[in-house]
Amino acid sequence: ADVGIAMGIAGTEVTKEASDIVLLDDSFSTIMKAVQWGRGIYENFKRFIQFQLTVNVSSVVVVVCSILAGFETPFTALELLWINIIMDGPPALTLGLEPIRDDILNRPPTRRDENIISKSMLSRIFVNGIFISAIFMLQHFTNFLGASPEQEPTVLFTMFVVFQLFNAFNCRELDRTPMYK
């Protein structure tokens, strides 16, 4: 962010009024802490977005593929609501509260014109979403787990929820590690 910083104790009134942030303790280490926290919050926000978009991509692909293939939709409206409210909430919240990484200040700053969703993040969203959808649809179409017709809706729902939990763990790392490591 482009912000002006003024010293609260030693700074003049003119600089305090012209600046965006006034340091109350006149310590430069406070600036470093603020930058560290800002970068950490930004990274956690990206993790949250990656998780939510992957869940939504896989949900849409599963429902659309089922309809186009002539199968019954795998989820009821109540199950989709449960996935989006109950299932997405806690994992997304924990991704938003991830501890700040130690090396965050060693990385270069984010460019002003950089998108929140990078190309590598977008590819991870779609690859993970399609992977989850493919395994789910394989079960939906072929029943490789051997569930009875009465058990099939429960198996599909549970499978989708478990995949989203794995997705939450996968979203803990953004760009620095290979997928599925």
Where on the chain are the PLM-derived regions?
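Membrane-embedded transport module
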Residues: 8-178
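Acidic, divalent-metal-coordinating active-site segment for phosphoryl/phosphodiester hydrolysis
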Residues: 1
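Mid-to-C-terminal catalytic subdomains of enzymes
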Residues: 181
